[in-house]
Structures are given as structure tokens and as C-alpha cells.
Amino acid sequence: MAKNRVKYLHIFTYTLFIDSYIDFINKNFDSKDHLFLILTDVGNVNDKKNVKKISKNFSSLLILIKEMYKCKKIFLHGLIHYQLLLILFFQPWLLKKCNWVVLGIDLYLYKLRKKSLISDLYEIVRRFIIKNLYGIVAFIKEDYELAKKWYKTKAKHYYSFLYPNPIYREINLPKINNKNNKYIYIQVGNAADPALNHLEVFQKLEKYKNKNIKIVCPLAYGYNNYRNKIIQKGVETFGNKFYTITKL
């Protein structure tokens, strides 16, 4: 049994770039050593054998907890999911093998969150967890320093590549002649994710739809259902001035 035990458990709470990241790990390392758990109730997940979808129901969360006990090391790709935070808060002995992979927004919630009783309680839980982590994986050393300053953590710092870098692909985009081009190109978002507030941005830009603008939406990553919704709304609002990038 010990021989088949997964060494490294990756827990994702944010879906951008997941497929490419998983493919990169499986291609360059032994896939049998890695298990990827994605905490989501929506969208499809990678169909690889070492990828599982974990929903909010009790039985799924039991699977998550079981895998957290079985593995050697845990990589937390984002510290936002409240159920994951509660699991770690009430089972703090798991923190000694947890490494937080900083996404950015999960660190800066310290500054960006709206003050309320629930928000304060949420931050108390996060503070306890971050303070007692084994390691923090951050591409930017300053992010690690901020985590130490804000959360008084003694976690070790581990340098890592920025998510897209190892899975970089070149894509051919049309060249724009700035001298003769009469349009202003506006990029909205960088993935099909509700957190990027595409619809709100569309509303603000709608009053300019008859001007010389073109809207470009990169939607190669993220949720399929949300992607379709954005494409439909973009075409309805901007017509042939709306462009998408759905494949890389």
C-alpha cells in the first residue's frame, strides 16, 4: 500500500491555467506521484487519471480529507475556499506538510476585503493557517515578505515559476498598423472566469459600441458555460466588433 501512496497532493481553488499546469507536471514528473483535486461545483475537469473533482457535498469533502492524510506533501494552489480553510483550521496538524502556492489575490485579500463580521472571522482563520504553514511557494519574493509581515508566519520560502511561464505557447495574432489603423483595441479579461467581471465591463463599454473600438476577449482558459455566456453577450452588445481567443 505504501508504494502506491501519492506523494504530492495539489489542491486547486482557482481554475485558471489548471489543465496546462497539470499537463506540465505529468509530462515532466512521474504522474503516479501527483494527485490533483479541484474544488468546484461547476465546469469540466481534466480527464487525466490523477485528477479528481471535489464538490461541496459531505462525501466529496471526506475524500479530500482522506487524501490530505495519505499524502507526503500538500500544495494549496490558492487560500480562498472557505471549506478548505475550515478543514485546515480544525485539523492544524495537517499544516506541517502544507505549502501555499500564492496566486496573488489570495494574499492581497488582506488589503482588498470589505470589512464585516464574516470577513473578520474569515481572516482570523486564514491568519492562523498562514502563520503555521510549512512553506510558501511564491514567484515574487516580495509576496513572501508581505505574508511574513501581515500574518507573522515563519513558513519557508520556495521560489516557483509564474504559472503560465512553463506552459508558454506562441500564437499568431494579426499585426496592427498603428499609423493606418482607425480602431482602438480593448482587451477584456484574460480567461473565462466570473471573477474577471466581463459582463460589468461590457456594460461600461456599451455606450462606446458605435465608436471606433474593437473588443478582444481571451477565453482559452476557464469555465465552458461561462465562456459561452460571455461570447453570446459580447456578440449581442458589440456585433462584429467583438473578437474572442478560445484556443491557444
Task: Annotate each language-model stretch with its function.
Residues 1-3, 162-183, 195-196:
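Acidic anion/phosphate-binding donor-loop and adjacent secondary structure
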Residues 10, 175-196, 202-205, 215-217:
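Conserved donor-binding/catalytic core segment of Leloir-type glycosyltransferases
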Residues 65-70, 116-136:
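Membrane-proximal helix-turn-helix segments that form the acceptor-binding/catalytic region
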Residues 104, 142-143, 158-173, 221-222:
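Short beta-strand->alpha-helix junction loop in the catalytic core
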Residues 126-158, 166-168:
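A short, active-site helix/loop in glycosyltransferases that binds the activated sugar's phosphate group
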Residues 228-248:
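Nucleotide-activated donor-binding/catalytic signature segment of Leloir-type glycosyltransferases, i.e.
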